[in-house]
UniProtKB/Swiss-Prot annotation:
Annotated gene: LHX2
This protein's record includes keyword DNA damage: no
Function: Acts as a transcriptional activator. Stimulates the promoter of the alpha-glycoprotein gene. Transcriptional regulatory protein involved in the control of cell differentiation in developing lymphoid and neural cell types.
Name this polypeptide is given: LIM/homeobox protein Lhx2
The organism's place on the tree of life at top rank: Eukaryota
Subcellular location: Nucleus
Ranges of the DNA-binding region feature: 266-325
SMART domains, sorted: HOX, LIM
Length: 406
């Protein structure tokens, strides 16, 4: 240090003053250093190194701040991103993809699923039971009605997210069991049904509680419906052919397969034909008994029916037509035999009956006209008996049978 324009005594006075001031400031500096060492445990930010808040992005000028996920936060800025809960006083907080969550929201969104029965969390190490998109504790997977625990392989049903054992679910579908109906009653009923079945009892004894036993698969009728029994040989032919008659007051029905429950009798949906549809189909049947795919397509356009319905109708019509012809032939033979017996026709070898008086022959003649689509088919059976035989009345009328097939 250089001192210019100062005498010797003045220089010594200045040096003494500087020494005195240095001695008086030394204790204050040491006390400040000691006090700073004790306050370093408190989170504070000095003005020369102020940090930015990870929540709002502003500078942290507060004396105290929060440190979470290796970032600084204002005490008011550390909040849950879902429910906006202030996490200043919370013991824990969770971070996922840069977002802060409270404990409840984190477990709700990212943790394991909760039990659908008790609504408690399920840890990753627990064994669970799954039904649809729901998860259950092993002890919580029980029947809602009887609290029977269901294990792997047991049959169960679900309705409105509620689990039922097989027996109670069947009863629930029928809506027949009372509120006090428990699993013991159903088990007793099942045992009684099994005993009754082994003893050969009927349906009433086999199911005392009236519960339909459900096997999980709906019963559906397969294949074609069973054929109805045709009328016997002695049935009235006109009444039998009335099903194919077309008039203003009658309509024909077609049986079709219909799924039906196993606990009820067979129910079939019946298709009714209108009069113009029947006339069109019967007119074509008089020309062709077995239409091909092209003909069926044309008929479907004319009648408005499906090809399947038309196929079934023509199949039934062909079957009835064949049965009527066979029955008519049998009826003609029977009447010819009866007439021959009444007139005393001699029986013997064929050589003894070769007389001209037996002409025309008593064999029935069948005439079938299918050329006109609008006229009904007439089948005539003519039985002639020789008039020169003894015991035969000369004016006996011939027997004629007219059969209307439509």
């Amino acid at each position: 240090m250089l001192f210019h324009s100062l005498s010797g005594p003045e220089v010594h006075g200045v040096i003494d003053e500087m020494d005195r001031r240095a001695k008086s400031e030394a204790p204050a500096i040491s006390s400040a250093i000691d006090r700073g060492d004790t306050e370093t445990t408190m989170p504070s930010i000095s003005s020369d190194r102020a940090a930015l808040c990870a929540g709002c992005g502003g500078k942290i000028s507060d004396r105290y701040y929060l440190l979470a996920v290796d970032k600084q936060w204002h005490m008011r800025c550390l909040k849950c991103c879902e429910c906006k809960l202030n996490l200043e006083s919370e013991l824990t907080c969770f971070s996922k993809d840069g977002s802060i969550y409270c404990k409840e929201d984190y477990y709700r969104r990212f943790s394991v699923q909760r039990c659908a029965r008790c609504h408690l969390g399920i840890s990753a190490s627990e064994m669970v039971m799954r039904a649809r998109d729901l998860v259950y504790h092993l002890n919580c997977f029980t029947c809602t009605t009887c609290n029977k625990m269901l294990t792997t392989g047991d049959h169960f049903g679900m309705k409105d997210s509620l689990v039922y054992c097989r027996l109670h679910f069947e009863a629930l579908l029928q809506g027949e069991y009372p509120a006090h109906f428990n699993h013991a009653d159903v088990a007793a009923a099942a045992a009684a049904a099994a005993a009754a079945k082994s003893a050969g009892l009927g349906a009433a004894g086999a199911n005392p509680l009236g519960l339909p036993y459900y096997n999980g698969v709906g019963t559906v009728q397969k294949g074609r419906p069973r054929k109805r029994k045709s009328p016997g040989p002695g049935a009235d032919l006109a009444a039998y052919n009335a099903a194919l008659s077309c008039n203003e007051n009658d309509a024909e029905h077609l049986d079709r397969d219909q799924p039906y429950p196993s606990s009820q009798k067979t129910k079939r949906m019946r298709t009714s034909f209108k009069h113009h549809q029947l006339r069109t189909m019967k007119s074509y049947f008089a020309i062709n008994h077995n239409p091909d795919a092209k003909d069926l397509k044309q008929l479907a356009q004319k009648t408005g029916l499906t090809k399947r319905v038309l196929q079934v109708w023509f199949q039934n019509a062909r079957a009835k037509f064949r049965r009527n012809l066979l029955r008519q032939e049998n009826t003609g033979v029977d009447k010819s035999t009866d007439a021959a017996l009444q007139t005393g026709t001699p029986s013997g070898p064929a050589s003894e009956l070769s007389n001209a008086s037996l002409s025309p022959s008593s064999t029935p003649t069948t005439l079938t006209d299918l050329t006109s689509p609008t006229l009904p088919t007439v089948t005539s059976v003519l039985t002639s008996v020789p008039g020169n035989l003894e015991g035969h009345e000369p004016h006996s009328p011939s027997q004629t049978t007219l059969t209307n097939l439509f």
